[in-house]
Amino acid sequence: HDTIPNWITYTVSWPPTLKNCLDYQWNEVAIPYWQGLVEQARANGVEKFALENFSSMLVWNPETLFRLRDAVGPMVGLNLDPSHLIWMGADPIAAARALGPAIHHCHGKDVRLERGLVNVNGLLETKPVEDVANRAWNYVAVGCGQDLQWWKEFFSVVRMMGYNDWVSLEMEDLTMSVDAGVTSSIAALQQTISQ
């Protein structure tokens, strides 16, 4: 039995066994598990699940979310974290439009692709987050990766798609103090969240 699944989130074109592994993960593990969990949650008054789109998880982008929703229903939605989509090379604004009412929560979290490093090593990164000087990308205070105009458009589109609820600040910028990062991020969010 899998106790700590390692979800396949990259190409399955080679080696051929990866396609079989991915099919197993979805059809034999994930979908049956989530069908049971949604049924149990509904029986206990839970209305929504918001899964964060992180790279090593089963649901890491709109396409994988919709695959799960098709199997288990709209109770499952996305906790839209734009920072993860950015370092995966996706456009969070386009993703928000595609997600529509499947946005169940939203993070205010930014990322910076590090010039000179991302160009050499690409976006996949396994160095610890503490190794900020050598990583291809780093989590940064809101506004230190994408400018404020970008954030205004992001939150505007999220709201147009029907999400008008909490935005959780995740301050994981290790290039500044926690106090400075929180203060800077709150100031950026106050200027950019659609009221």
Model-derived regions: residue spans:
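A short, mixed-charge helix-start or loop-turn motif at secondary-structure junctions
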Residues: 19-23, 136-140, 171
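Gly/Pro-rich active-site loop or hairpin
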Residues: 62-66, 86-163, 179-180
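C-terminal helical cap(s) of enzyme catalytic domains, especially alpha/beta-barrels
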Residues: 178-195
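A general structural motif
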Residues: 44-48, 73-75, 101-103, 160-166
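Active-site beta-loop-alpha junctions enriched in small/polar residues
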Residues: 2, 52-56, 81-85, 109-113, ...
